[in-house]
């Protein structure tokens, strides 16, 4: 994996004449489409543990949150080529725009720790539209390929792609050996291809309003239709992912036959354009602590 799944940031700073220790942990939940940062400030053992001391610690948490949010987001995949850190390097202006997300973050009620030894607080932002709007650069969806020959298909209510098991990574074959097998990694802007590398859904083919509403696809580890009926409806096209694609394996590859069943129908192409896609991934990819 390109990034370590769990990162605990620990640092000490001086404030109001006493040392306070700050712990920061971030978590992304693709089921709820939220990114959360939990900060915890511990009062130094040499400082009196009064309500005023805890209040100062809480104030420090709020001051440190923008930096913790920025650092926590850096490893998050945007697409199969970039994590947010890469995007910031290519466009430094993104750094200030990401930092501004802290202003509108949801904040939990501060939670005093036992014996007033500190305080913790959780902050969260939504992936859609708060974060994705920073990376969507088109206003009108690009036209998708249309299959004009007759294809056995029908109108579906959504598209469900099963990708919970390790998949062959496209392009990883070496000599006569089998390809590397990887878990599909959720991303803000995933793409879909068939196994011949024909584009089925690229970033600029989806309606920006759909991305703002609920993202390109809904990630879940639930196979029960009740868990994703609102997104894919009651009669979805169910597809098995064939391969994963990308430097970061975020993109799904499906069979040419399944791709044809989608691209041969105006109705089914609109399912892609409107983000009526569910991707079933392994449970450890859904709720990730960094």
Question: Where is each model-derived feature located?
Answer:
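Domain-level marker for long, solvent-exposed, non-transmembrane regions
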Residues: 18-290
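Sec-dependent N-terminal signal peptides
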Residues: 4-13
């Amino acid at each position: 994996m390109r990034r370590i799944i769990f990162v605990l940031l620990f640092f000490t700073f001086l404030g109001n004449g006493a040392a306070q220790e700050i712990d920061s942990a971030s978590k992304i939940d693709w089921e709820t489409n939220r990114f959360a940062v939990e900060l915890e400030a511990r009062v130094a053992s040499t400082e009196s543990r009064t309500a005023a001391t805890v209040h100062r610690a809480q104030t420090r948490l709020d001051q440190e949150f923008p930096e913790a949010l920025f650092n926590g987001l850096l490893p998050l995949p945007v697409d199969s080529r970039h994590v947010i850190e890469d995007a910031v390097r290519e466009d430094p202006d993104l750094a200030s725009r990401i930092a501004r997300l802290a202003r509108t973050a949801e904040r939990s009620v501060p939670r005093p720790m036992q014996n007033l030894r500190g305080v913790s607080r959780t902050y969260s932002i939504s992936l859609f539209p708060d974060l994705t709007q920073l990376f969507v650069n088109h206003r009108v969806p690009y036209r998708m390929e249309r299959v004009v020959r007759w294809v056995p298909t029908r109108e579906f209510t959504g598209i469900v792609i099963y990708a919970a098991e390790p998949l062959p990574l496209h392009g990883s074959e070496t000599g006569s050996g089998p390809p590397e097998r990887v878990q599909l990694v959720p991303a803000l802007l995933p793409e879909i291809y068939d196994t011949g590398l024909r584009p089925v859904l690229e970033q600029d083919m989806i309606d920006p309003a759909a991305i703002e509403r609920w993202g390109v696809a809904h990630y879940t580890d639930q196979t029960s239709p009740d868990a994703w009926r609102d997104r894919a409806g009651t009669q979805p096209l169910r597809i098995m992912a064939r391969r994963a694609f990308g430097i970061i394996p975020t993109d799904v590859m499906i069979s040419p036959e399944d791709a044809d069943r989608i691209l041969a129908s105006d109705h089914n192409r609109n399912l892609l354009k409107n983000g009526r896609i569910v991707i079933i991934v392994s449970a450890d990819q859904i709720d990730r602590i960094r």
